[in-house]
Amino acid sequence: MRDQRIRDPIHDLIKFSANRKFDEVLWKLVQTSEFQRLRRIAQLGFAEIVYPGATHTRFSHSLGAMEMARKMLTILKHNQVVQESENDENATVCAALLHDVGHGPLSHVFEEVSESCGIKIHHEDWTKQIIEDSNIGTILKDFDSAIHKNGLSFFEVEHGSDLYSTIVSSQFDADRLDFMLRDRYFTGVKFGSIDPAWIFDCLQIQQLSIDPDSEAEKYRFVVSQKGFSAIENYFYAYTELYSKVYFHKTSRAAQIMMKQILSAVAQDPEILPKNNPLKVYFESTPKPLLETYIRLDDSIIWATIRFLAENNSNQVSNLSQRLLNRNLFKCFELPKPPKEEIDPIKAGKFERRLKENGMKFERDRPQRKGYKVYDTDYLKNILVSIEGETYPKALDKLSNWVEDMSKGRPHRYYFENTEDREIAKEIYKAIS
């Protein structure tokens, strides 16, 4: 193999060097049909309905996660605390590259519909099966069966069980670092700030007891005091991405409509042509073959939506036409102060009034995500080293607001048209 380079807007050049044997393996993995399929799966599902630039794919994100893992591994080399393991390093980079290879189309909507119709196989399970049984598995086994086994173990062990697994899956991992930078870039949002170069420079590796009262120890990444504000801003940006991008009310409307369409197809696959991959998939409930699953991508779903829009005259056809033309359900979000919750009694009364008036609606309560506090597994917290302190402190113990960022779930109701939404507003006003 000669040197290979991929131009990337986040990492500039992602390189595969002819001088590194495992880079040739990584390049072969990228060329497999299973990995190339990720070119046809959007990273953010329906976000481009609101943010037209957000058309990037899980393919580019997976390459970015691999590159981010490489950068994080250099921290281990520079600290010279942990004995280097080429096998572990290669497996870590490989796991970062392949972490999304089992993703289905349309982000998480497709998985929710699959589960509701009896296919209870999550994308993480498909990832493991692809690494085990596809061309990807063959390439890894032919190079080194130990790396194949080690790479697969990242998707089986408990998150954050050692430094290498922390790079692949944790609150500050290669996946999250890349998608936050990438999603901000392609959506164009400006809130918060992410400074991975500074955070990396402020990362230390310390051998710590599992909790302050335990004698058992593990190596962990620890943020130095100089990186405190940067890690706070990182979690602020993470929370805002969920609030303003991933859970945007308009893209959620499109998700709800797509979910209704796919649910109708799952219940009656006969409305699709004989060899439609989506029809074959839903007819193979509860356990589709791997080859059936990996035929699915966003292009298959949208071609099916086009077919339904043009070949039926029922509710599914109407929904499909509306989705194609961005004629979306209308949202009414119950008003409330930030970080507070809606009174459940009041919300229940509102829903009863809606039903009494014969109104059709969909409720949506997305859970805001932010910093997660671990009470029983202390080392999974983001730890900050404080000058003069012998043991680092968890981020939530130092920040006045980082734990509160994810509070205050939105309480939304979606209606088929503007008229119904306005009626709903009047009903809510009457009970306030």
Language model features: what each stretch is:
Residues 1-91, 101-432:
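Histidine-centered, transition-metal-coordinating active-site segments
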